């Protein structure tokens, strides 16, 4: 690791998770009898990051496309997460979480189910210079899309064209899309489809050995009383397998377990917004410097995560 800044070396899918509500217990399990636990204050939230092995997708200058993915249990299984190079998971209202998957240079026939925008996800779309895809939006997200002049693709206006409905899931958990459809929509709107912006993280196929890291063969993140996510390290395949609500998460298209190579957790506060609709929508205090963890190959190290503005990319610093 480079001093002052982590070389976040991505080989598999990146997931960024923000857990909400209650006391957050983040566990690094060495073995069945030894557990190290880091406990946050109430409403302290982690962001987790994972990555994908298709390094060829970073050889070009294709602009990323971000897609909001439904994570309600009625939406399971989801499609496209394993094809994304980065996925953010953040708390939303009702104790649920939502995912934002990023695609670059990928050809994915089915992505979804697609759900509505939340304003703090826009921060991470901006730092990745991504076209932002959603199906509807909260009032705060609608305001920010206009305020920041976000290049977005909204399923409300493109249902039946860019998006289609599947019969094996009930609305609102049944809208899907594809990278081909999204690119066609972006081109029709005359959005730029290339980008020269530097990636948020550095990518390599080399293995990362966290020699001085603490054991992390099992990582548990209770976002709320409703949603607990767990990653279990498979020593044979050298990836983390994803579980949610004690269920192994499967890919909708392949039926295989959803996996990741690298995880980044950032701890920051979330809170309930006060608005006229009173739906319990969340806000996120994600601007500043926060504690975090980088996790890969069954080990974890502490890091600092710095985000100076909503538009600027997050910087991850090694503590060494």
Question: Model regions: which residues?
Answer:
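A surface/extracellular/periplasmic glyco- and lipid-processing/surface-interacting theme
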Residues: 5-7, 36-84, 93-320
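Hydrophobic single-pass membrane-insertion segments
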Residues: 22-37
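N-terminal Sec-pathway targeting helices
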Residues: 2-17, 27-29
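Residue-level detector of intrinsically disordered, flexible termini
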Residues: 18-19, 24, 185
